[in-house]
C-alpha cells in the first residue's frame, strides 16, 4: 500500500510517503519536516514528499493521521486534509496515537528498557504512557492518561527514560523526541482496520470545561435580562 502520513501534533510537523511505491517487493520512505509553532504550509509539505517519491496524488491509497495528544490546531488540520482527500479520492484512513508513534520512534532510535512518553497537557498536567522496549519490539505497559508532574517524576525516578517533544522544559533528564510521519506511516502499514473520516477525532483525555449558557430570562415588560 502507498501511504501518505501526516503528523502535525508537535512543533515539528512532518509528512511522509511510505510503502511499495515502485510496486510489490519494493520499499519507499520519503519525509519532509517543518519546524516552528506557527508552521502552516501542509500542502507544500505534501507536494514535496509526493515529488520526492515520484508519486501522483491519485496514486495514494491510504492516509495515516497522528491523532495526538498535542497541538489541537495541528491535529485538526491534518484531520481536515484527510477528510477532504477521502471525499475526493476513496482512500483508506487510519488514525494513530502520537504517543504510540513516539514509542515506536524511541525503539527505532535504539532506546531499550522502560520508556515513558510525556506530552504537555497544560494546566500543570501531562499526558503519560509507559512502554517496555526490547531488542525486537515495544509494548505498552500502562496506557495513555493524564498525570500530575509528580507521577511523571516518579516514573523517571524508577528508571524510565522520559521522552517527548518538550519534555526538558519540565524534566531536565528527559530526551527530546518528536513524533515522525515516517514512523507513523510504518505503523499504519501494519493496520488492518480503517476508519471513516467523520470518526477521526483528536485524542483529548480531559473532559470539556465549557458550560452551556442558560436561556435568557424575560422580564415582565418583555425585555431580556
Report residues per predicted region.
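DPxDG-like acidic metal-binding loop motif
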Residues: 62-93
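N-terminal phosphate-binding loop and adjacent alpha-helix
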Residues: 31-51
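Phosphate/pyrophosphate-binding loops at sites that engage ATP/ADP/AMP, CoA/4′-phosphopantetheine
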Residues: 46-62, 133, 152-160
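Oxyanion-binding and handling regions
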Residues: 1-24, 34-41, 94-225
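Conserved phosphate-binding/catalytic region of the ribokinase-like
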Residues: 26-28
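N-terminal, well-ordered alpha-helical segments
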Residues: 40, 44-47, 61, 79, ...
